[in-house]
Amino acid sequence: MKTETTYMKTLGKVEAKLSRMKEQAAAVRWFYENGNLSESYNRSLRLEELSEQAVLLTRVLPAYTGATGATAQTDAIISDTIPVEVGFTAEGWFSVRIPALLPKKASGSADYIRSYLYPAMRKFFEGKPPVRFRDCVLAYRHVYDRSRPERAMRDHDNIETNIVTDILALYVLPDDHPAVCSHYYCSAAGSEDRTEVYVIPKHDFPMWMVEEKTLPDKGVKLYEVRFC
C-alpha cells in the first residue's frame, strides 16, 4: 500500500535523524566537558540543524497515515507550539509577530518557516478579503533576548526572510517587487527572542522609525480589522 510505504519510509528518516541527533548531543557534551567550547558550539549548530530537519519530517508523518483531519490537527499543534500573532496596529499597519528569531538561510529553513507562518496567515484572513499595501516598506525587527547580547550582531543578509516576504505577499502585497515594497532590517533588545514584521505605507515610515525606539517589550496591540 503506497500510504504505508511512504509512512514507513518517512518514519525511517525520522529515526535516522534522531540517531544522528543523539550522536551530536553526546559530542556537544564531550567537547564542552573537555574544554573545547568552540567545537562544542559547532556541534550544537549541527544538532540544531538536525533537529529542524526532524521536525519537518515528523510534521508530515501523521498525514501519511491517511487519517481524516491529520493536517488540521497538525496545524493546531503547530499553532499552539509556535503562536504567531497576526493583525493590524492602531495606525493601520499590518504586522506579524513570530515568537522566535528567524533562522539562517539553510536547507529546510524556508520549509520550516512556511509550516507555521502560512497556516497562521490563512487562518487570520479566512473569510476576510486580502489587504493590498502599495508603495510600502516591509520592516523586519529582530528582537533578541537581552541576556544574549551576541545575537544583536546578526547578519541580516543571511537570515531567511524571503519565504516570509513571499507568504505576506499572498495576502497584503500586490507582489514583493522593489517598486512596490522596500525592505528595512533592524535589531532590538527584549525580554525574549521574537521577530516582528511590519508592512507600512512609505509615507508612514518616518513615524514608524520614531515609534520603533519605544515599542513595548511584548509588542503593540494587534487588531483583527484595519481601522485606517
Question: How does the language model describe each region?
Answer:
Residues 86-90, 129-134, 189:
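Short glycine/proline-enriched loop/turn "hinge" motifs that connect secondary-structure elements
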Residues 1-75, 81-83, 89-93:
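N-terminal targeting/trafficking signals and adjacent low-complexity tails
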Residues 83-102, 139-144:
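Short amphipathic
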Residues 177-225:
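C-terminal edge-of-domain segments
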Residues 60-63, 127, 167-171:
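Amphipathic alpha-helical interaction surfaces
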Residues 107-112, 211-213:
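Extended Gly/Ser/Thr-rich low-complexity repeat segments
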Residues 110-139, 146-148:
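An N-terminal amphipathic alpha-helical segment
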Residues 145-187:
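Short, hydrophobic/π-rich interface segment
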